[in-house]
Every structure is written in C-alpha cells, then in structure tokens.
Amino acid sequence: MNTLDLVSHGPVIPVIVIQRVADAVPLARALLAGGVKVLEITLRTPVALDCMRAISAAVPETLVGAGTIRSVADAQAALDAGCRFGVSPGYTRDIGRACRDIGLPLLPGVATASEVMAASADGYDFLKFFPATAAGGVPMLKALAGPFADVLFCPTGGITLQTAPQFLSLPNVRVCGGSWLTPQDAVDAQDWARITALARAASALRQVA
C-alpha cells in the first residue's frame, strides 16, 4: 500500500489517543459505522500498540496506522503490531529510510519549505503538514503550492469540522487529519453513537468540499 492510497477511503483520518485497550475495538467499529475506515492510533499511551493489534485482528475492514512515530524503533514496533502505515510529526532521514527498508508506508510530518525539500529529496511527495493551524494553515499551504506543485499534503493539527472544508478545497490537499472525531470525553463515556455521528459528519465532507 502507498500512503496516497489512504485518500481514496475518505476526506478525514482520525487522530486517535486511546487510554484503555477495552475501548479500542468498539471505538474502531463506531468510526467504521460512520464511514471512516482509515485510523491513526497515536503512540502516546502505553497501550497504543496493544490497541493496534486488537483493532487489526477484530476489525480487519479498517486500515490501522501508527501516529507519533519518532524513531526507527517506533516504526518497527508499529509494523510488528500489524499497522498498514505510519505517521510522523516531523521528518528525519533515518526514519524515512528505515520505513522504506522495512516496508512501512510513511506519511512524514513537515512544517517548513526546508522540511518539504528534505522529505521530497528522499522520495516522499505526500506529506503531513503539522501542526497545520499553528504553522500557517490555509495561507501557508497556498504558499507551498507554488514551489512544490508536485507535493500533496494531509494537514493535521487544530483542524475542526468547521474549518476542514477550507483545507480540503485546496488543490494540494487530499485529506485532513483530525482529533475531533474521537473526543476524549466521548471515549471515556463509551458514547459510541456520538463518535459514529461525528464520523458520518466527517465522511460527508467529501461531498461538500
């Protein structure tokens, strides 16, 4: 799988933090019921890898990826947990080359023109623009489109259901990352119906963007 394949499954990739393994499978099923198939599980909790394994085994219709990859070891652990892709908050040549060597498709993070050049030089032309809002948002992506007409972006960070259409309307944006689909209070309360509703609203952005 190529990371660019992810865009064919919907306009938003949820950026997910899971605190309890028991929540992983019902959360994935709730998102899938709302039309969201691609899931980014961040490596920000001790149970993240176990959650990836659980979802991959119990909900094979999903495409599980690992977010917050910051080292070669993280990339290998994600692959071993059954992840189909990885996402990093930034880019280093070591991570980029390691992911290619082990066969883990990577969506590397960038925030500046220099970082875009570094990732592009290593063969990555679909990049995570992070943190999207803090790094300049829509105006910055418009500015990057000039010198980097061959690069596509997945803006992530500070995006909401209300602002996502502004990003998705850009010609160099194919998909957005968003944490708003899985608010922590809804997960803690196991309010799967609310999460399904949020997923449906995000999926509908494909039609209105």
Mark where each language-model region is.
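Glycine-rich phosphate-binding active-site loops on the catalytic face of alpha/beta enzymes
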Residues: 85, 89-95, 128-138, 172-194
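Hydrophobic, well-structured mid-protein blocks that either form specific transmembrane helices
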Residues: 74, 79-119
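CoA-thioester-processing core
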Residues: 99, 106, 137-148, 155
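Short acidic active-site motifs
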Residues: 51, 73-74, 94-95, 114-115, ...
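Anionic-ligand binding region
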Residues: 113-127, 137-147
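Conserved N-terminal beta1-alpha1 strand-loop-helix module at the mouth
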Residues: 1-84, 101, 150, 161-162, ...
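Glycine-rich beta-to-alpha transition loops that act as phosphate-gripper elements at the mouths
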Residues: 17-21, 66-72, 88-92, 108-113, ...
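Short hydrophobic/aromatic-enriched beta-strand-loop microsegments
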Residues: 62-66, 84-90, 105-109, 125-131, ...
